[in-house]
Amino acid sequence: MAAIRHLPNTIWALLMAFSAPAVFAAPVVSLNVEPFSTPLEQLNQSGSCRRCDLRGADLHGAHLIGADLRDADLRGANLEGANLEGADLSDARLAEAHLQGATLTNAELSGTDLRRADLREAVVINAYAPDVLTEGMEFAGSNLTGSHLIYGGK
């Protein structure tokens, strides 16, 4: 190696690199995670929107199967025809929400505020709903088979 020390630095560095023992480094991973710009974007991309402010949101016909909407504020939201099968709506505020024809099969509704909500023709099979606020709730034509709705007061 001493005989080739007169080579330019770049070539010298290459020769040294190939004659040196290999060193493997772990790859560097950069996570540039951008925060969601809106609660709707968060819900659409992650399926989770705990404590989100979705008041008056238009979620008509949305596919929210298994969504995590615990403590979300959905007052006055349009969820007509939405599929919320298996969704967790524990302690969510759905007062005056429009849920006509929505599917809430196997949904978790404990502590949910459904006052003056419109659940006409909704499918609420096997939903678990203790301490639900139901004053003025409309549910004519709804399928409540196997659901446990326990009125929690006003």
Regions found by a protein language model. Give the residues of each.
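Bacterial N-terminal signal peptides that target proteins for export
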Residues: 2-11
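Tandem repeat scaffolds
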Residues: 26-154
